[in-house]
Amino acid sequence: GGSCGQCRVDVHSGGGEILPTELDHITKGEAREGCRLSCQVAIKQDMEIELEESVFGVKKWDCEVISNDNKATFIKELKLKIPNGESVPFRAGGYIQIEAPAHHVKYKEFDIPEEYRGDWERFGFFDIESKVDEETIRAYSMANYPEEEGIIMLNVRIATPPPNNLSLPAGKMSSYIWSLKEGDKATISGPFGEFFAKETENEMVFVGGGAGMAPMRSHIFDQLRRLKSKRKMSFWYGARSLREMFYTEDFDELAAENDNFEWHVALSDPQPEDNWEGYTGFIHQVLLENYLKDHPAPEDCEY
C-alpha cells in the first residue's frame, strides 16, 4: 500500500499523524490541509473525512472472462464481459480494481503459446507456484476506450520473482489473473482515475513501454475514434524485440486514417530475426534525441 498515491482523502479530524509513505505523494502544504492516503490511515477513533463526489459513483461488477491471451512473452490481455444491461462509465486513462480470492496457482498450468514458452522454460518460471491465503485487490488501467462498450480490457504483466531467486514470492494478483480462463468469473470495482486528457488544442505526446500500453491505447483511441480530434499527436512505444510488440495493426490503422497522428517504436534488444532498421534503445532517450530535442516548444506539449 501507499505506492500509487491515488486514494487521496481529506481528513478533517482523527486519523493520527501523516506517515512517511504518504509524504512521497503529498506535499507538506497538502498535508497541513488534511490530505492523506486512505490506504495508510488506520481507523482508531471517530473521524471526519471528505471524499470526492466521484467516489460515490463507484460500483462493483461480477464479470465473465471472454479471453486471456498472451500479447507478449510476459503480458496478457484480459478481456472481461460486463453483466448484461450494465456499463462501467469510465473515462480514457481511468482504471478499475480487481479482486483476487485466496488461491494456489501453479505456473505450469498457464496457457502460454509455443512462441513464448522458450523464455519461460529458460528461466524456470513454470516451476513457480503462488500461494495466497487472503483476498488481494490491485488496480489496472483500462486498455479499451469508452466506446468499446460491454467489456473491460486490461494488459497484465506477470510479476515473477527474479530468475536468480525463484524462492521469492510471485505477484499475488498477476499470478491470479494469468490463471484465469474463458468462462471464469472475476470481480471488479470502479471506475477510478485522474489520468485524463486535458481539453485543449495542444500537441499530445504519448510515451509508454511494456504493459504501460494500456492507458496509451485507451487515450489514443478515444481521441481519434470517439472525439475525432485534430490535435497533433504522437505515440512513442518501447519494447525489447518485435516479439514483444502488440496492437501494431491497430496503431498502423490509426496512423493511416489520421494525418495528425504518428507512432514510433524503439527496440531495446532487437533479435537477429527481427531485421530491425528502426530506433533502438530506451524509448525516453529515443524520444528526446529524435523529437523533443529539436522541438520548437516541448514545454507546450501535453504528455
From Swiss-Prot:
Entry's Gene Ontology BP terms: sodium ion transport
SUPFAM superfamilies: 2Fe-2S ferredoxin-like, Ferredoxin reductase-like, C-terminal NADP-linked domain, Riboflavin synthase domain-like
One Gene Ontology MF term: oxidoreductase activity, acting on NAD(P)H, quinone or similar compound as acceptor
Cofactor note: Binds 1 [2Fe-2S] cluster.
GO cellular component: plasma membrane
Chief site of localization: membrane
Name of the protein described by the UniProt record: Na(+)-translocating NADH-quinone reductase subunit F
Designated gene of the protein: nqrF
